[in-house]
Amino acid sequence: MHGTATNPYRTHTAGELRASNVGQRVRLAGWVHRRRDHGGLIFVDLRDRWGITQVTFDPERGEVFSAAERLRPEWSVSVEGEVVRRPEGNENPELPTGEIEVEASSLRVLNASETPPFEIDRERPVDELTRLRYRYLDLRRERMRENILFRDRVVRYIRRYLAERDFVEVETPLLTKSTPEGARDYLVPSRLYPGQFYALPQSPQQFKQLLMVAGLERYFQIARALRDEDQRGDRQPEHTQLDLEMSYTTQDEVLQLIEGLYTEIVERLTEKRVLFKPFPRLTYAEAMERFGSDKPDLRFGLELRDVSDLARSSEFKVFRNAVEAGGSVRGLAAGGLGDLSRRELDGLTEVAREGGARGLAHLRAEGKALKGPVAKFFSAEEQAALREALGARPGDWMFFVADRDPVVFESLNRLRLHLRDRLGLADRDALAFCWITDFPLFEYNEEEGRIEPMHHMFTMPREEDIPLLDTDPLAVTGQLYDLVANGVELASGSIRIHRPDLQQKVFSIIGIDEEEAERRFGTLLRAFRYGAPPHGGIAPGIDRLVMLLRDEPNIREVMAFPKTQAARDEMMDAPSPVSEEQLRELHISLCLPPEERRNP
């Protein structure tokens, strides 16, 4: 019950009345979901957060009936009346309240409503900008309301799970120092310190490590992360993550903790099932070799196979040249495609080209032979070897990409996911969690000609690889781990560096000298000199997890007030200009780009 006898609006919610309440006088408050006139009676479906209750208005109650005749969708009302059973045959099994209705004896219109810009009582396609502009109305729709309520249940479960394991929830500052972590910082000018700026945190990374130095040992926070980066896919300038850190911990301990949390969330809060328990663990190298991605979807097969050795000795120059140039030839076999037309094959080739491939070679297993435009370049023995390498059965298609490894992996990964969707290979009710571990600590940025951290600069190398920092840093493996489910990265974490000398060495490898390190990270380096314990953690994204569990196409559908893909808040019209007076107070003058570049 969410009201009381003295509450002037409601004694009950619109979702709680049952047959056991028959004969009771109740008050309900909410919105007019639908209104129908039948045989002289008016039927109103009254909706609130908890559900819908049918209310009837009898013409014998003249004034109340007249008021009901004027009701329109989304008017806010309060109704008083008696709970009665619905006439036999008129029950609605689709509603928890479907056995009863309320015979209204009084009606108060609390607020009328303009005609909404879209229907709220029906799930019909609506332009996304309109939905975001009127988000407060969009959130009244059942699917959106359920998304937000489910998100709340997930966050509550996380808090309870971690509290039971002695974690302490600590809020870290939102106004902090600018130390870019791969994306641009959002900057906040200081009025009290002219020409100086705070930054909004891209993550609480340094603060949570400092909390480990402070001795809290087990910390978590439902944290906001803000990044001024180019918007693509389902990224948002601000998102929510479970930020977590532990002292005196190991990679295994972090993985087991999160594995237990995610398994419980899925099994206790959803109807989905966890496909593999315990979660499989794949090294980064293994994931790339088998799936062409460090975010593999394990709900289906279509694994990649390396046929470079076969290609090296073949008569097919495209394959042979790629291998001789230091690249590779890999392929996958797919059944269930039937006869593919030239147009369909061109479409698959285009999918591969989106990953950078210059082409897509194809063969089809027919009987004991292979058919296709490149089959003539392979002997019968080579054809049999290719077929065996890919595990192709009669009728299967075999697709190959020959190029540098990054291009081969990206192209075949795109093709694999395209075939997944085309053939319906993935069970939507299954969650195939897996851990990706042993990432390289560094990668080489060819455009800028320098070494960069693959994840971030605070990651501890594997102990046995520390000597390689001086001789071959690109060969160093980091104590890094990602959690992936159904091809979506849900979390990223690592064991952290806790020694100042080692942290400075990593800084120097990525081009941060001692002076810059002191300026940007001096507090952290100083803290490490005071007996900093070994520590590690992880930061699962709340938005992506809820998106996955609710089968939504993007994270905007599970956020109350998201930005557009162009990083605009359509509802509040932000970002927006500020007054000259505000700028003067902050000692800021504007140097704007040309008009055509100002509003993307």
From Swiss-Prot:
Chief location bin: cytoplasm
Q: Which GO terms describe its cellular component?
A: cytoplasm
Q: Which residues bind L-aspartate?
A: 181, 227, 455, 496
* Compartments in which it is found: Cytoplasm
Q: Which InterPro entries match?
A: Aa-tRNA-synt_II, aa-tRNA-synth_II, aa-tRNA-synth_II/BPL/LPL, Asp-tRNA-ligase_1, Asp-tRNA-ligase_1_N, Asp/Asn-tRNA-synth_IIb, AspRS_core, GAD-like_sf
Which stretches of sequence are listed as region Aspartate? Answer: 205-208
**Where in the chain is the site Important for tRNA non-discrimination?**
38, 89
Q: Which UniProt keywords apply?
A: Aminoacyl-tRNA synthetase, ATP-binding, Cytoplasm, Ligase, Nucleotide-binding, Protein biosynthesis
Report the catalytic activity.
tRNA(Asx) + L-aspartate + ATP = L-aspartyl-tRNA(Asx) + AMP + diphosphate
Tell me its EC number(s), please: 6.1.1.23
Give the residues the record marks as binding ATP. 227-229, 236, 489, 541-544
GO terms (molecular function) for this protein are:
aspartate-tRNA ligase activity; aspartate-tRNA(Asn) ligase activity; ATP binding; nucleic acid binding
Q: Does the keyword tRNA-binding apply?
A: no
**Function per UniProt:** Aspartyl-tRNA synthetase with relaxed tRNA specificity since it is able to aspartylate not only its cognate tRNA(Asp) but also tRNA(Asn). Reaction proceeds in two steps: L-aspartate is first activated by ATP to form Asp-AMP and then transferred to the acceptor end of tRNA(Asp/Asn).
User: Which PANTHER family does its entry note?
Assistant: ASPARTATE--TRNA LIGASE, MITOCHONDRIAL (PTHR22594:SF5), ASPARTYL/LYSYL-TRNA SYNTHETASE (PTHR22594)
Stated name of the protein: Aspartate--tRNA(Asp/Asn) ligase
Q: What is the lineage of its organism?
A: Bacteria, Bacillati, Actinomycetota, Rubrobacteria, Rubrobacterales
